[in-house]
């Protein structure tokens, strides 16, 4: 019968009760260990000191600077697109380096000829040897079929057969040029470099963190990030158009309504992107036509997440972090009334304002913004609230039950009573679809609790009961093309980055090398000791120089 107690006792026998063979093996192992530790201290192997260059900060930083790839080394800047409070956005394309070969094959006329490779360093089994034989046979047949002789690679059909065609026809098509948008954040004020580096802005940190986590076809895709000369460069996929440009095209020089089918497609894709943000607990807080991009293939993408913020498990209130959010014309009424906490409904109000602007070709609530005073006090936006009341009417407790709870509620009592004029405005702007007007009412609801959310807005009759289904391409069915985005090529201040970076890298390398030579290649610990010794010597020297004066004073 199995006895667990006996097994436990056998497992933990004292050393003297174990078989002599085991003890002999342990003695032999201990003897070998002692034999290998001859010349060591207390039987321990001596520590091998690493190369001092590893612990030297100067050469390490210089080496990292030399290895770092500059944004201008990887991208060719064509010009800048727009400028704002955060900095500038540039249009760029990838640099083409025709002199280097790729890892998969050599470069042929700007393209990589990929031939299956086999790693000869790995142990080969029978199946792997058969695979290699098949690969070699395939390679020989490929060269034979293409008329390629060793040492000569042909890229035209003329070299293959003289009876084919006298005109050269390239087998490999040249790839299309892919453009990118580089967003450079400001580090200088009024063209003068700051004396003290204040670090990366909060807006840049939020945008980098969120763009690295969020992935949706209706959000601008972040390609990579560069940190160069204390400046952040964020590389995005390029979008040829934005809603502000499209609205301007239809409103100048004379008004021409945007096709209803195009408006429906834009709104559906926009709401789909907003729904994705809200389902991932992210508020955008700056939705406006200028931040809604449209690619050349008609895909709507939401950009500029500089004011975006997660609203799940917050450490502080939304008002504490940012007291002013959303551009004034697209700001929700609860924000105008001083709400300290708000919901994703503020984004849906902005979407409603964008919807109205696509219909009327101008902002529906175009108020004048009151600026901050010298004390940086947030002013009450009287004119903006008045523009909203003139179109939607004056709210009351029946429409907005918690209206009296807002800090700036008393401001509403100062206005005269307005009636609802949204339907009148809609028909005067040329709107004919009753479902579009219904969705507009749901998006521009005063009460943020009753305001429709993005998920339910996608199921609205405006999208589900239309004669023409929603298209994934907003340009589908158009007989005209929108002009390309205007690029400013006369103000490429980012081009000065390359020469300054190169000079600074060389200077830092020289300075670091000189410092390392002066200290004799000392490691970090020895450098600290040397500095401490120098400081002690300086102090003792000062004390010795002060000693004669003290003696004179005593006399």
From Swiss-Prot:
EC code: 2.7.11.22, 2.7.11.23
Entry keyword annotation includes Metal-binding: yes
InterPro entries assigned to the protein according to its UniProt record, in alphabetical order: CDK, Kinase-like_dom_sf, Prot_kinase_dom, Ser/Thr_kinase_AS
Domain of life: Eukaryota
Induction remarks: Protein level and kinase activity are reduced during nitrogen starvation.
Disulfide cysteine pairs (residue numbers): none
Protein keywords: Activator, ATP-binding, Kinase, Magnesium, Meiosis, Metal-binding, Nucleotide-binding, Nucleus, Repressor, Serine/threonine-protein kinase, Transcription, Transcription regulation, Transferase
Comp. bias (Polar residues): 100-138
GO CC term, one of those recorded: CKM complex
Gene3D superfamilies in the cross-refs: Phosphorylase Kinase, domain 1 (3.30.200.20), Transferase(Phosphotransferase) domain 1 (1.10.510.10)
Localization in the cell: Nucleus
Reaction equations catalysed: L-seryl-[protein] + ATP = O-phospho-L-seryl-[protein] + ADP + H(+); L-threonyl-[protein] + ATP = O-phospho-L-threonyl-[protein] + ADP + H(+); [DNA-directed RNA polymerase] + ATP = phospho-[DNA-directed RNA polymerase] + ADP + H(+)
Entry annotation: catalytic residues: 286
Any one GO molecular function term: ATP binding
Chain positions covered by the region annotation Disordered: 100-166
Binding sites annotated in the UniProt record for ATP: 81-89, 183
SMART domains in UniProt: S_TKc
GO biological process, one term: negative regulation of transcription by RNA polymerase II
Any Pfam family: Pkinase
Ranges of residues in domain Protein kinase: 75-463
Function recorded in the entry: Component of the SRB8-11 complex. The SRB8-11 complex is a regulatory module of the Mediator complex which is itself involved in regulation of basal and activated RNA polymerase II-dependent transcription. The SRB8-11 complex may be involved in the transcriptional repression of a subset of genes regulated by Mediator. It may inhibit the association of the Mediator complex with RNA polymerase II to form the holoenzyme complex. The SRB8-11 complex phosphorylates the C-terminal domain (CTD) of the largest subunit of RNA polymerase II RPB1 at serines 2 and 5.
Record's subunit section: Component of the SRB8-11 complex which consists of SRB8, SSN2/SRB9, SSN3/SRB10 and SSN8/SRB11. The SRB8-11 complex associates with the Mediator complex. The SSN3/SRB10 and SSN8/SRB11 kinase-cyclin pair also associate with the RNA polymerase II holoenzyme. Interacts with TUP1.
Family membership noted in the UniProt record: Belongs to the protein kinase superfamily. CMGC Ser/Thr protein kinase family. CDC2/CDKX subfamily.
Protein name: Meiotic mRNA stability protein kinase SSN3
Species: Saccharomyces cerevisiae (strain ATCC 204508 / S288c)
């Amino acid at each position: 019968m199995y006895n667990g107690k006996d097994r436990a006792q056998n497992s933990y026998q004292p050393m003297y009760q174990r078989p002599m063979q085991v003890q002999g093996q342990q003695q032999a192992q201990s003897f070998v260990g002692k034999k290998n530790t001859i010349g060591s201290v207390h039987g321990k192997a001596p520590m091998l000191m690493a190369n001092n260059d590893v612990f030297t900060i100067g050469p390490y930083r210089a080496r990292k600077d030399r290895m770092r790839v500059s944004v201008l080394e990887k991208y060719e800047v064509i010009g800048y697109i727009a400028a704002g409070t955060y900095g500038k956005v540039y249009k760029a394309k990838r640099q083409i380096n025709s002199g280097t070969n790729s890892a998969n094959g050599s470069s042929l006329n700007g393209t990589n000829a990929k031939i299956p490779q086999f790693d000869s360093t790995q142990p080969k089994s029978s199946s792997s040897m058969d695979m290699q034989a098949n690969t070699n046979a395939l390679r020989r047949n490929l060269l034979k079929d293409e008329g390629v002789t060793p040492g000569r690679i042909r890229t035209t059909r003329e070299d293959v057969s003289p009876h084919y065609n006298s005109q050269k026809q390239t087998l490999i098509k040249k790839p299309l040029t892919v453009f990118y948008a580089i967003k450079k954040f400001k580090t200088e004020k009024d063209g003068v470099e700051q004396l003290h580096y204040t670090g990366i802005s909060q807006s840049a940190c939020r945008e980098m963190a969120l763009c690295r986590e969020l992935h949706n076809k209706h959000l601008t895709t972040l390609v990579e990030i560069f940190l160069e000369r204390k400046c952040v460069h964020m590389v995005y996929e390029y979008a040829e158009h934005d809603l502000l440009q499209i609205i301007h095209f239809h409103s100048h020089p004379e008004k021409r309504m945007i096709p209803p089918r195009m408006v429906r497609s834009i709104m559906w894709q926009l709401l789909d992107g907003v729904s994705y943000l809200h389902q991932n607990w992210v508020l955008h807080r700056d939705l406006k036509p200028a931040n809604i991009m449209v690619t050349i293939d008609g895909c709507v993408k939401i950009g500029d997440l500089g004011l975006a913020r997660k609203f799940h498990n917050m450490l502080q209130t939304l008002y504490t972090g940012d007291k002013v959010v959303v551009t004034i014309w697209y700001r929700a009424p609860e924000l105008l009334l001083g709400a300290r906490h708000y919901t994703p409904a503020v984004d849906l109000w902005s979407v409603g304002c964008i919807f109205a602007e696509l219909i009327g070709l101008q902002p529906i609530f175009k108020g004048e913004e009151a600026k901050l005073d010298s004390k940086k006090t947030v002013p009450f936006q009287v004119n903006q609230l008045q523009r909203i009341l003139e179109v939607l009417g004056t709210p009351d407790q029946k429409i907005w039950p918690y209206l009296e709870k807002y800090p700036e509620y008393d401001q509403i009592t100062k206005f005269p009573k307005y009636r609802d004029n949204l339907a009148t405005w809609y028909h005067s702007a040329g709107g004919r679809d009753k479902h579009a007007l219904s969705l507009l009412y749901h998006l521009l609801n005063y009460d943020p609790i009753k305001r429709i959310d993005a998920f339910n807005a996608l199921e609205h009759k405006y999208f589900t009961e239309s004669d023409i289904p929603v298209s994934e391409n907003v340009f589908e069915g158009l007989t005209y093309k929108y002009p390309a985005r205007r690029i400013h090529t006369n103000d490429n201040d980012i081009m000065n980055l390359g020469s300054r970076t190169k000079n600074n890298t060389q200077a830092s390398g020289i300075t670091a090398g000189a410092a390392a030579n002066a200290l004799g290649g000392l490691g970090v610990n020895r450098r600290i000791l040397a500095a401490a010794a120098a400081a002690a010597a300086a102090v003792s020297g000062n004390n010795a120089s002060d000693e004669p004066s003290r003696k004179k004073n005593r006399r």
